């Protein structure tokens, strides 16, 4: 069996992709491991139910929505290769590192309305190369075919 830690460097080298992309992917994976732990613990960790706040779409946030969002933001802000991020749970993008070369967009907990009935949820993410110039909303508005990487992590 090949682990992700073994696969990523080989894949990046085989396809002449920058090592920094692997680092950003690893940051997403590390955050998802933490989110998975919270999802599995559920009621035992006291993380089920409403958070008492809403997101930008006007949806009621679940406690796990907020936790997953905070975990992903912290993990990505810690990576110097991340220039900025955009989350479904935030009003606007979050700038990270001026010299970073990647943007990460995500829904931290897709399907969170399913949490209380024990149906699968997940994290959707997309990694884009940051365009030249100052970080702006338009930086995140790129064609899907221009993604450096994307994925769905199922919990």
Where are the model-predicted features located?
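N-terminal subdomain of lithium-sensitive/metallo-dependent phosphomonoesterases centered on the IMPase/IPPase/PAP
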Residues: 1-109
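DPxDG-like acidic metal-binding loop motif
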Residues: 100-155
